[in-house]
Amino acid sequence: MTRNVVRQEFEAPGKPQDSSQQDACLILVKGNWTTNEMEVK
């Protein structure tokens, strides 16, 4: 569910989704996971 929300934020209106946008989403999600891990520690 979170991944869908992030993907919508990265989607540009009127442009088809491409691999570069997907990579950006994955990088953002990984960054969020890293931040959460640091907060737990």
Swiss-Prot record:
Highest taxon of source: Eukaryota
Native organism: Homo sapiens (Human)
Stretches with biased composition (Basic and acidic residues): 1-12
Listed name of the protein: Putative uncharacterized protein MGC15705
Disordered, as annotated region: 1-23
